[in-house]
Structure formats: structure tokens, C-alpha cells
């Protein structure tokens, strides 16, 4: 964490460059690699720390407080080492056998499929929104398995860089620096050992668990994946808060006879409200992850009720973070609108992150309410 803290000012200074490039600068990715961040969720057998997931998300929060796009990509790329740990040992050797620093991008939206063939699958598709794909040597792509013309499973296909192309299409209003371009796969054979069923992850029968037995790898996918999306947004809220307080401390309000913003009692109220909500968002998000992890460390299972609570609070944390950024942005004055200012960038980045499917509040709230009534839940993202 000390090495990461030392890097934050540099990431903050590069935030505009990151946005202009529409991808994370190579120097930033190299520096993050050197801090050991990407090894946090990597198995010990491959030189990783297989760490407490709260430590990982705390690091993500810090990175995102300096640069939203860098935090977003770091979170997503970083969690893929956790996902790869659940694949077969052979798949892990394929990726990490020669280089344990290899990075993996993803797109889990079913924008392609795999046709069953002898020894594996023939995969075709165009997967949008693969954040950080320019910095990855492999991709994990979600989609159905098709057999006899019918979908029989939903899986992740693990595919090396030489077997797909990247279409540079990412030109957007928020999270511009994430390089979330489209991964295109055409008639690529993927062997069986490089395919992992989401069902196997959910019921803890993933083949990687035979060797990677640390508690972190038994965390529910329905907690890990959504938290990976929300943690950087909460980090952006912390960054927006710091930027707002600094801005208000210097701001003179032209419309109020030169009154200093820091002397405005209403400005102080908004700061207090936003600060409280941001802290509440983080406490809920990290607290549920900590509770689940503590149970697994103790050798116990994570009850379904806790998994539902984690999803409920994860979308609530995202909502709280974004509402707080809105409150701060609305009271920052016209100077905060200028291109290059951090507050407007955090505002755009957080709202862009909000549209991710994992942040759909109604879906998570309906699941929680359904569970409270003791009714069956069919949603798999829990």
C-alpha cells in the first residue's frame, strides 16, 4: 500500500493524458505492476498474494480517487487473476507458465458463442466493452455453449491475444481513458481446459479450487464481480470530494459580492452530507465483503442471506457515491465545468460507470425483496 500511495500523485497528474489517449498510459500500467497491485488476487503458486479481497478493493478505491479511468481498469484487470485461479491448472499454466505478470481483459456480456466440437469449442463473436484490452495478452469472454443448435451452458472462454483482434471504437463521454474497445473472435478453437462454466463457479466445483484452496477463491462470484464495478465508483467519489473541498477553499463567488465559498454555511452542509454518504457507501461495500471473507477464513459457508445483502448494498453504495458527486458538482460553480478540471471528470466517469449492468439497482433490490418473502430467486448474479 505504501508503494501505491507514492504512485497516486503521478496517476492524478496523468488523468487528463489518460482521457486524451482513451486508454491507460503504458507508464501507468507498468508502475501499477511494479507496486504489486495486480498480484493481490493472484494465487500463491504463481507468485501472488491471494490476499484479503478488502485489501484489493481498498487499493482500487485509492487508485480511482486519483484517476477514475485508471481505477476502473485496475479493478477489472486485477480481478481477472482471481477468475483465472478458478480455471483448470492447465489453463493457468497456459497463461502464467512463462510470465506471471500476464494481464487479462474481459467482456462477460454474451456477444458471441461457442459451438461444441471435438476437444473443445469453435468461438465466434464481437465482445464490446473490454476495458484495458490494449494492455492484456489474454481475454476472458462470456457466452453460451451451443450444442445441437441449443444453448446448454453459459461459460467463460479464455483466448490468447493472437486469436482475436481489437476494434478501436471507444470514443465516449465518460471513462474515456479505459480503452474499453471491442474484442472480435472469428472461428477460433478453444480447448475444453480453457473454458469455465459460471455454474461451476457458483457451486464451488470450479477445477481451479483443487490447487487454489485459499478462502478468497471461495468468495461468491455475485459479490466479487459487482464489487469490482462499484469499488472504483466509490473511489471516484472520494476523489471528487477532495477536488471539491480544495476548489471551494479557493473559490470566490462572483454572484455574492465576492463572498468566499468556504464561508458559506450551505456549502459546508453539502460537504458534510456528501462526506457522510461516501463513507457510508464504502462501509457497506467493504463491510459485506469482509463479513463473507471472515466466514470463509473460519471454514464456514457464506449464507445466501448475506450474499443478497451484499448485492443490495453494492448497488446502494454506487447510488450513494454518485448522488454525493452530483451534490458536490452542483455546488461547485461554473469554473468546475472547464475541461481538464478533476471534478467534472469524476462526475462523467462515475455516471459512465453507473450504466454497467452490475449497477442496476432495481434488479438487486427485487432479488433482496424476493428473498425476504422467502420466494425462489432465479437471478444468478448473487
Curated annotation (Swiss-Prot):
Disulfides per UniProt: none
Assigned keywords, A-Z: Aromatic hydrocarbons catabolism, Flavoprotein, FMN, Lipid degradation, Lipid metabolism, Monooxygenase, Oxidoreductase, Steroid metabolism
Domain of life: Bacteria
GO-annotated molecular function: 3-hydroxy-9,10-secoandrosta-1,3,5(10)-triene-9,17-dione monooxygenase activity; acyl-CoA dehydrogenase activity; flavin adenine dinucleotide binding
CDD domains in alphabetical order: NcnH
InterPro entries (UniProt xref): Acyl-CoA_dehydrogenase, Acyl-CoA_DH_C, Acyl-CoA_Oxase/DH_mid-dom_sf, AcylCo_DH-like_C, AcylCoA_DH/ox_N, AcylCoA_DH/ox_N_sf, AcylCoA_DH/oxidase_NM_dom_sf, HsaA
Catalytic activity: 3-hydroxy-9,10-secoandrosta-1,3,5(10)-triene-9,17-dione + FMNH2 + O2 = 3,4-dihydroxy-9,10-secoandrosta-1,3,5(10)-triene-9,17-dione + FMN + H2O + H(+)
GO cellular component: cytoplasm
Keyword Transmembrane helix: no
Entry's EC annotation: 1.14.14.12
Cell wall biogenesis/degradation among keywords: no
Pathways involved: Lipid metabolism; steroid biosynthesis
One GO term of the biological process aspect: steroid biosynthetic process
Binding-site residues for FMN, renumbered to this chain: 72, 106-108, 129-131, 251, 334-335, 356-357
Gene3D superfamilies: Acyl-CoA dehydrogenase/oxidase, N-terminal domain, Butyryl-CoA Dehydrogenase, subunit A, domain 2, Butyryl-CoA Dehydrogenase, subunit A, domain 3
Assembly notes: Homotetramer. HsaAB monooxygenase consists of an oxygenase component HsaA and a reductase component HsaB.
Function: Catalyzes the o-hydroxylation of 3-hydroxy-9,10-secoandrosta-1,3,5(10)-triene-9,17-dione (3-HSA) to 3,4-dihydroxy-9,10-secoandrosta-1,3,5(10)-triene-9,17-dione (3,4-DHSA) in the catabolism of cholesterol.
The protein's name in its UniProt record: Flavin-dependent monooxygenase, oxygenase subunit HsaA
Biological classification of the source: Bacteria, Bacillati, Actinomycetota, Actinomycetes, Mycobacteriales
Amino acid at each position: 500500500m505504501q508503494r501505491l500511495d507514492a504512485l497516486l500523485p503521478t496517476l492524478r497528474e496523468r488523468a487528463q493524458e489518460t482521457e486524451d489517449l482513451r486508454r491507460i498510459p503504458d507508464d501507468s500500467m507498468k508502475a501499477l505492476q511494479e507496486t504489486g497491485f495486480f498480484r493481490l488476487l493472484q494465487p500463491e503458486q504463481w507468485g501472488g498474494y491471494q490476499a484479503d479481497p478488502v485489501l484489493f478493493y481498498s487499493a482500487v478505491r485509492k487508485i480511482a480517487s486519483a484517476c477514475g479511468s485508471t481505477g476502473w481498469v485496475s479493478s477489472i484487470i486485477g480481478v481477472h487473476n482471481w477468475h483465472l485461479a478458478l480455471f483448470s491448472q492447465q489453463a493457468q499454466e497456459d497463461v502464467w507458465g512463462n510470465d506471471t505478470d500476464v494481464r487479462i481483459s474481459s467482456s462477460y456480456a454474451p456477444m458471441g458463442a461457442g459451438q461444441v466440437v471435438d476437444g473443445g469449442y469453435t468461438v465466434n463473436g464481437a465482445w464490446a466493452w473490454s476495458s484495458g484490452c490494449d494492455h492484456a495478452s489474454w481475454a476472458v469472454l462470456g457466452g453460451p455453449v451451443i450444442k445441437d443448435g441449443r444453448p446448454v451452458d453459459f461459460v467463460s472462454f479464455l483466448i490468447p491475444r493472437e486469436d482475436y483482434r481489437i476494434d478501436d471504437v471507444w470514443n465516449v463521454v465518460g471513462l474515456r481513458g479505459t480503452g474499453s474497445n471491442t474484442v472480435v473472435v472469428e472461428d477460433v478453437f478453444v480447448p475444453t481446459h480453457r473454458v469455465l462454466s459460471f455454474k461451476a463457479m457458483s457451486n464451488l466445483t470450479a477445477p481451479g479450487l483443487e490447487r487454489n484452496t485459499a478462502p478468497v477463491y471461495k468468495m461468491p462470484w455475485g459479490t466479487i464481480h459487482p464489487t469490482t464495478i462499484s469499488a472504483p465508483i466509490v473511489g471516484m467519489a472520494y476523489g471528487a470530494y477532495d477536488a471539491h473541498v480544495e476548489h471551494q477553499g479557493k473559490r470566490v463567488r462572483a454572484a455574492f459580492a465576492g463572498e468566499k465559498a468556504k464561508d458559506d454555511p450551505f456549502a459546508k452542509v453539502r460537504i458534510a452530507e456528501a462526506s457522510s454518504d461516501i463513507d457510508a457507501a464504502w462501509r457497506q461495500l467493504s463491510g459485506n465483503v469482509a463479513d463473507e471473507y471472515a466466514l470463509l477464513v473460519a471454514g464456514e459457508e457464506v449464507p445466501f442471506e448475506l450474499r443478497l445483502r451484499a448485492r443490495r448494498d453494492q448497488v446502494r453504495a454506487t447510488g450513494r457515491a454518485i448522488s454525493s458527486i452530483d451534490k458536490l458538482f452542483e455546488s461547485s460553480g461554473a469554473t468546475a465545468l472547464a475541461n481538464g478540471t478533476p471534478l467534472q471528470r469524476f462526475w462523467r466517469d462515475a455516471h459512465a460507470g453507473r450504466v454497467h449492468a452490475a449497477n442496476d439497482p432495481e434488479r438487486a433490490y427485487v432479488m433482496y425483496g424476493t428473498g425476504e418473502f422467502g420466494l425462489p430467486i432465479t437471478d444468478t448474479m448473487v
